[in-house]
């Protein structure tokens, strides 16, 4: 009788390995090698012998979960947060702040030289601030537990979509951290618990603003409970529906923040930097590097609500701000009016598309500043080169796209003159940086 070949089923057991960590990447993630393959592992430090479980096995590399540190590094420290082992909010509390910054700086230089093929200059001093209670913005995950029949509030678990319930967070501004427990208590009293999405907390100068995602239509009883909660906590509360519409449920103040003597108003859903003091330092450094005078016309791309535009307008002859979100363009215009600035103009434009035919794009500019989101600004870089400004300052929250986009400037005749890191997000793998290019 013929025998048919039956391939053996692949084992579903996760592979467990032991190896030595050699270095850290710019996310403060450990890198080692096992059987010739690069292994990325959070929570491990250079020099450590570790035991790990493979999570995601690719041809050239793999991601692994730390199970045991066999030989700890001398610079390993105890995390200051009780939730650190589980919570995915921070990933570098086991490393001192100076070592975190050094790893990120080394990663920044490596990305420029390896990915961008650009020789990095000696880095500028890191812009630093407080490393705890620094976040003025956070997004809390909310999940209804069917088994416990209760609503849980916290952050996503490390390397998972599960939720870690927390009582407080030491990197949040203290008023935001103190709001978590009473918020959980309030949400557990709602009839519409299953329809809750997430809650965004923002610390404005006037107080706390909360944007609560609600995918249904809360009844009058739930609305009354939420309003009572907002009043008792002294916060403003907005609801965001599934179609993204935002409804003020309890509004007392117009949120704003101060910047270099200016007052910048914002609204729920607007982007603002999470670290207020570092934002102040960042804007001051960008203005100093750009060096605008009363003879200069400046272009500010991805301008948001005017975070760089309005301080620049006090130095330059004229500033043009361009932003893809129409609501933030309107907010930037209002911020110019409320601060008595009449030499700033704002336009809405999709900066990932073709901008050649736009009126502002045909104007001449002496200086350019850009501060794009994580995807970077590749589509607009060629046009920046064509404008031929004297200097370009690029502020970035993603060093990978910064290094990539910088190639366009260098090939267009610009030199990378200054490069530095801003410690906007201590204890995390996020890296903010700034680069200056000159013709």
UniProtKB/Swiss-Prot annotation:
Q: Which residues bind S-adenosyl-L-methionine?
A: 273, 302, 307, 323, 350, 371
Per UniProt, where does [4Fe-4S] cluster bind?
Answer: 81, 87, 90, 169
Record GO terms (molecular function): 4 iron, 4 sulfur cluster binding; iron ion binding; RNA binding; rRNA (uridine-C5-)-methyltransferase activity
Q: What is its EC number?
A: 2.1.1.190
Entries under InterPro entries matching the protein: 23S_rRNA_MeTrfase_RlmD, MeTrfase_TrmA_AS, MeTrfase_TrmA_CS, NA-bd_OB-fold, SAM-dependent_MTases_sf, TRAM_dom, U5_MeTrfase_fam
| Swiss-Prot/TrEMBL keywords | 4Fe-4S, Iron, Iron-sulfur, Metal-binding, Methyltransferase, rRNA processing, S-adenosyl-L-methionine, Transferase
The family line of this record is:
Belongs to the class I-like SAM-binding methyltransferase superfamily. RNA M5U methyltransferase family. RlmD subfamily.
What is this protein's record name?
23S rRNA (uracil(1939)-C(5))-methyltransferase RlmD
Species of origin reads Aeromonas salmonicida (strain A449)
Starting at the broadest rank, the lineage of the source organism is: Bacteria, Pseudomonadati, Pseudomonadota, Gammaproteobacteria, Aeromonadales
